[in-house]
Amino acid sequence: VRLIRLIPFNMMFVRLSSSYFFYFALLGLISPYLAIFLDGQGFNSRQVGEILAIMTATKIVAPSLWATFADKSARPLFIIRLGALLALVSFSLLYWFSQYWPITFCLALFTLFWTAILPQLEVHTLTSTKQSSKIYARIRLWGSLGFIVLAVVAGETISRLDYQVFTSLGVIILAGLFISTLLLTPKKGGKLNKGKTNAPEPIVNKLIDGRFISFFIAGLLLQISFAPYYGFFALFLRDFDYSGVAVGLFIALGAVAEIIAFIYMGSLFKRFTLNSLLVFSLAITALRWFLMPVVADSGLWLAINQLSHAASFAIYHSASMKFISSHFTKSQQSRGQGVYLGGVYGVGGAVGAYITGLLWLGGEGASNAFIMAGTSALLGAIIMVFSKK
């Protein structure tokens, strides 16, 4: 009953939710199973880590470039649609290549265009919902649902068929994403004054603010910590003889916990400060990674550990978006999102993926990789504890 009340059926909600659904459905395919695909191509752990690092490194600059273009053009929906279309085209190139450098190029090109979508979609959603944390969380949970569906479906499909079905699944999802972006409509009265779009408000003072610097570094460390999970978790579970559907269910369980957290984010924002939510998320994440190699051989304890994804992702992500929304002015939102996603997800993800690739050693160094991850998240928590309130 509560879930039914939480889903307002109006066209704005449906359009935004469908875009989030397909965007994160693709993440539900790529995050767990790209390593399976690359492993099937014959690449070793170091090569897999390098490819993941190169893909993620494109996020360092690309989001800011796309965001600046969006701010100056005042056409965020055009950026979203263009990114979705070009991501579809570039991902489709995987059908024709099987060697290391061509595949690396295709995936890097795909990521370059894919990064154009989420920052603008977040800004468009926050603008359309008038900065309502509750409505945003309800829309965003459909992204989690998309992730769950693909994590389970792809795990079983790849297990039953072949790792090469990965490409076809990605193309289908990206086609759905592109179609969903065509259904998005601009907010009424939301067009910017064209006479002012050529001189966007500077954001340097916002970027050098001590509170933002602490927030940025903590986010960077969190993303470094996620690298073993995002890039190698499916391979990790496969080494413990879990089936394809079991791998998908473990990943989906984390996303279910994430959805529940998103539902209650409005209440959490009323009861706790942003800083306390960020510290809590980082601390729980550190514990999660430290426990991962310890509980991996027990399905029950691994499932319990996966529930902490509610804090690791949902609470931290929602708090981060609220921080960015309040820290930057309306005209700075796209660039603020771009700097955050480019620096935190780009640098953090790339560094984490590269280090994990070096530590993994075909699975023999998995424990060391998760210890590195836990230490990184713990450092992030300490930074936020001493951050300026």
Language-model features, listed with the residues they occupy:
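Cytoplasmic helix-loop-helix junction between adjacent transmembrane helices
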Residues: 108-142
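Hydrophobic core of transmembrane alpha-helices in multi-pass small-molecule transporters
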Residues: 21, 90, 100-117, 220, ...
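A membrane-interface helix-boundary motif in multi-pass transporters
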Residues: 156-173, 358-377
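Helix-loop boundary and gating motifs at the non-cytosolic
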Residues: 9-56, 211-250
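Multi-pass alpha-helical transporter architecture, strongest
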Residues: 95, 176-186, 371-389
